A protein has these predicted regions:
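Metal-dependent nuclease catalytic cores that hydrolyze phosphodiester bonds in DNA/RNA
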Residues: 1-214
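Short acidic (Asp/Glu) and glycine-rich catalytic loops that position anionic groups and cofactors
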Residues: 29-33, 235-240, 291-294
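Short amphipathic alpha-helical face segments that pack within enzyme cores
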Residues: 51, 218, 254-262
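Hydrophobic/aromatic-lined pockets within catalytic cores
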Residues: 56-61, 221, 236-239, 264-268
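Metal-dependent nuclease catalytic regions and adjoining charged, substrate-binding loops involved
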Residues: 91-106, 153, 245-253, 261-347
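Secondary-structure boundary elements
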Residues: 191-196, 221-229, 264-278
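Glycosyltransferase-associated regions of secretory-pathway enzymes
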Residues: 194, 207-216, 223, 332-347
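Non-catalytic protein-protein interaction segments used by genome-maintenance enzymes to assemble
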Residues: 204-253
Length: 347
């Protein structure tokens, strides 16, 4: 399995999000997204969700990506604009860079360059820690966000199910003899059968009837001894106690079933297993990011998928996307091209 292209950069493959674009906005929109003509949305809630995921699943990556600023932070959009202009300045002389940055954020009518420079120097001094941290390329985390992360982690650690599901990544080998134990202790595990694996942010490139697909699972546990795989997905929400609404609004069942398809392809094509011999579990670990910062774990059952017709919806969508990909016809639906131009409603 070739995953040399980072997940979010590979636009040649169909993700669960791509299926959502196709179902909600049609083939032309999907094609434009895949071609990079429509940028991805970036909202504060999405950015916060990414931060929480990384903090819980990739703590080392979190340290390399985020930084708590100990000094004063910008108090207005004008100060933030001043900082961004200053760190992106191509001016060689620092005084000119300061003046230009200040003028980009504030009106300097009636003020001399010397007066502007004095104001800019004072502001740069007040924000020096923030400027240095921003120049480092790391994302700045607020005091509140750090407290939020701590609250969520503590609540997960004290939750009797979430704490069992969200463990650090590991690989356990089968050891049938003392020499096998010695191999594990010395790290010479080549040739030893694997009993269990736990992966976070697990990237799978797979195929559906020749259509190139991709999935990025929050957490995947593979139990080779008992032939059971467990998918765990983290969700941040403000609807923790009526999470059913979020399940329907964001079509989380579709996402989880798509992950199941990816895992079963992976077991068969990459691990030499027959997925029909395997059982499965799916869990959603939902975290409230406001008020009490509670955590709830939801066990997704087989009946949930079938009651929602999830299987049919995904397979129908993939078949349609496959058809559009093969024919190159993206302006209208497959039904439009196959008939007289009229289309039916799924009422």
């Amino acid at each position: 399995m070739d995953i040399s292209i980072p997940y979010y950069e590979d636009m040649s493959r169909i993700s669960n999000s791509a299926i959502g674009w196709f179902l909600k906005k049609g083939p032309a929109f999907l094609r434009a997204k895949l071609d990079g003509k429509i940028p991805d949305e970036s909202t504060p809630s999405l950015e916060k969700g990414t931060m929480i995921h990384m903090y819980l699943l990739q703590p080392e990556e979190f340290v390399n990506t985020y930084k708590l600023c100990a000094g004063q932070k910008p108090k207005s959009t004008n100060q933030e604009r001043f900082v961004q202009e200053l760190i992106n300045s191509t001016e060689i002389e620092s005084d000119k860079a300061l003046i230009k940055a200040y003028k980009s954020a504030y009106s300097t009518v009636g003020r001399t360059d010397a007066e502007t420079l004095s104001k800019a120097q004072q502001m740069a001094l007040e924000l020096k820690d923030y400027i240095a941290d921003t120049r480092s390329g790391k994302k700045i985390v607020s005091d509140y966000d750090m407290r939020l992360l701590g609250w969520i982690k503590t609540n997960i650690d004290h939750h009797k199910m979430a704490s069992k599901l969200l463990r650090p990544e590991f690989t356990i080998y089968e050891t049938k003899a003392p020499e096998d134990e010695a191999k594990v202790l010395t790290g010479k595990t080549e040739g030893l059968p694997i009993a269990e694996e736990l992966h976070h942010e697990f990237h799978i490139n797979w195929e559906y009837k020749g259509l190139k697909c991709k999935s990025l699972l929050d957490s995947l546990h593979l139990d080779f001894k008992h032939k059971r795989y467990t998918i765990m997905d983290l969700k941040t929400t403000v609807k923790l106690y009526h999470f059913e609404d979020s399940m329907k609004e964001y079509d989380y069942l579709r996402q989880l079933y798509y992950y199941r398809m990816a895992v079963e392809w992976y077991l068969e094509h990459e691990r030499g297993e027959n997925p029909k011999d395997w059982d499965w579990d799916c869990f959603i670990i939902a975290m409230n990011t406001i008020e009490q910062k509670d955590v709830r774990v939801f066990h997704i059952l087989s009946s949930d998928f079938y009651n929602d017709n999830t299987t049919e919806r995904i397979e129908d969508a993939l078949e349609a996307i496959k058809w559009h990909t093969e024919t190159g016809q993206w302006e209208h639906s497959r039904e439009y091209y196959a008939g007289n131009g009229c289309e039916t409603l799924n009422l």
